[in-house]
Amino acid sequence: PNMDRLVNQGMSFTQTHVMGGLNGAISQPSRAMLLTGRGLMDVHRNGQIIPKNEKTFPELFRENDYTTFGTGKWHSDKAAFNRSFSTGANIFFGGMHPYGNEKEEKGHRCPYLHEYDPTGKYKNGQWVNASLNTFSSELYADAAIKFIETNASNDNPFLMYVAFTSPHDPRNVLPDYGRKYGSKEITMPKNFVTQHPFDNGDLNERDEKLLPTPRVPEQVLAERANYYSMVNEVD
């Protein structure tokens, strides 16, 4: 309902499609394209680095006297983040949260996040001291809420960029709120096949590693149920 309300009160791009990527990361070039307005073949190194000549839209706001705030996933270079945002909190520069095993509380409950560093160094090991029981979405939402509350009475305009990492895998631990879907409520897509129908040059890349092949419908249904549950959790 909250996402629906944002759409109804704002703007929704209903004909937006992922163009693909030049490596296993699809979100990385998509993010760079969204930030710069460039196409897939025009973003630098699949979006790993956003050079100075490719201005991001937060940069343009910042140049026009907006306070720009960023929280959540970035997964491009740190210099571009600091050009784009004058401040931030609970920042994730990686591609995904760490996988764990049945005895470890990892994944979205163990995000490696940085506080905003004006120097742009963001050294590894200097993480936000967050409880392992705090889900990633809560950390990003709390950072955004705190920023709004701090700037509510400020006459200076601001732009806030909030990038949740859920429902990105690993989908290993769910928080105890929001509706949890059961696999019996989820249907398989009509185009489901147990494995890729032809050799595309790399049959063991990224999503193909999430589950063994040939795919078993029951496992796919469980994965899709977790995915929808995490979308509901973000909402």
Enumerate the language-model features and the residues they cover.
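Formylglycine-dependent sulfatase
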Residues: 1-235
